[in-house]
């Protein structure tokens, strides 16, 4: 069983309001990583992100900061072109205070360009979470294992795979793929079976070798998320 860090996802509009800071402070003991989603901000810029990070840095000693731009292709709001998306991810390396950066994986990516960006982020001491999301279904077990394998070839700190289950076997396949991968690879693994059906993957993440589990602060930012206070309490049971 692995140690699991609880990630709290927030998705502010343009700025970090005092009410949001209060909500974070109220849950501070349950948060190991704060994920700042930025894809909900139309035409978001590095300067806007830097301003938000500055406001969050006041509390940063309590948790690590992860920045994520989730594209529409993988279930988010982001509508940047692929080049604009990758340029933004690369430029985030210059922002002090960011500890972790999410970069998406697709089967048709430019492998060399992706590797250059990941290496660039790591040179600026950013931990990389390479992720893939399927909000429609859960692929077969061998395909799940193949996706984990392809993502870890970039030598990130974390590989994250989130899929949508339609039955209990889908949940079991995701957990099996994560468990097998965590036993054989060096990087940390995250496996999420979304929706209420897959809640066990969030609460028992560590049992199957997972390193991060994602919750929310009030309003869920993904199917199946529960409040981080409840999530932390559940995770500590395993």
Curated annotation (Swiss-Prot):
Sorted alphabetically, the keyword list is: Amino-acid biosynthesis, Aromatic amino acid biosynthesis, Lyase, Schiff base
- Pathway of action: Metabolic intermediate biosynthesis; chorismate biosynthesis; chorismate from D-erythrose 4-phosphate and phosphoenolpyruvate: step 3/7
Quote the catalytic activity from the record.
3-dehydroquinate = 3-dehydroshikimate + H2O
EC numbers listed for it are 4.2.1.10
Record GO terms (molecular function) = 3-dehydroquinate dehydratase activity
Q: What Pfam family is a match, any one?
A: DHquinase_I
The first-level EC class reads: lyase
Tell me the active site: 133 (proton donor/acceptor), 160 (schiff-base intermediate with substrate)
| Domain of life per record | Bacteria
Record: residues binding 3-dehydroquinate: 35-37, 70, 202, 225
Q: Which InterPro entries match?
A: Aldolase_TIM, DHquinase_I, Type-I_3-dehydroquinase
Which BP terms in the Gene Ontology apply to this protein? 3,4-dihydroxybenzoate biosynthetic process; amino acid biosynthetic process; aromatic amino acid family biosynthetic process; chorismate biosynthetic process
Q: So what family is this one in?
A: Belongs to the type-I 3-dehydroquinase family.
What is known about what this protein does?
Answer: Involved in the third step of the chorismate pathway, which leads to the biosynthesis of aromatic amino acids. Catalyzes the cis-dehydration of 3-dehydroquinate (DHQ) and introduces the first double bond of the aromatic ring to yield 3-dehydroshikimate.
Assembly and oligomerization: Homodimer.
* Protein name, entry field: 3-dehydroquinate dehydratase
Q: Identify the species of origin.
A: Staphylococcus aureus (strain NCTC 8325 / PS 47)
Name of the coding gene? aroD
């Amino acid at each position: 069983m692995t140690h699991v860090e609880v990630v709290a996802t927030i998705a502010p509009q343009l700025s970090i309001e005092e009410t949001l800071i209060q909500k974070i402070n109220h849950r501070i003991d349950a948060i190991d990583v704060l994920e700042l989603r930025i894809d909900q901000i139309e035409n978001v810029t590095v300067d806007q992100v830097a301003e938000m990070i500055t406001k969050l840095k006041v509390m940063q000693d309590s948790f690590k900061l992860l920045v994520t731009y989730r594209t529409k292709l993988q279930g988010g709001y982001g509508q940047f072109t692929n080049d604009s998306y990758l340029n933004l991810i690369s430029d985030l390396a210059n922002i002090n205070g960011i500890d972790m950066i999410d970069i998406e994986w697709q089967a048709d990516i430019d492998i060399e360009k992706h590797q250059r960006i990941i290496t660039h982020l790591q040179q600026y001491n950013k931990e990389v979470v390479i992720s893939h999301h399927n909000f429609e279904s859960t692929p077969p077990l061998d395909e799940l294992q193949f996706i984990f394998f392809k993502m870890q070839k970039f030598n990130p700190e974390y590989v994250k795979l989130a899929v949508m289950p339609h039955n209990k076997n889908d949940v079991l396949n995701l957990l099996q793929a994560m468990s097998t991968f965590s036993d054989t690879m060096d990087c940390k693994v995250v496996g999420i079976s979304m929706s209420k059906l897959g809640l066990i993957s969030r609460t028992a993440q560590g049992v199957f070798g997972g390193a991060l589990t994602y919750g929310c602060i009030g309003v869920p930012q993904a199917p199946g998320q529960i409040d981080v206070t409840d999530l932390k309490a559940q995770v500590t049971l395993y």
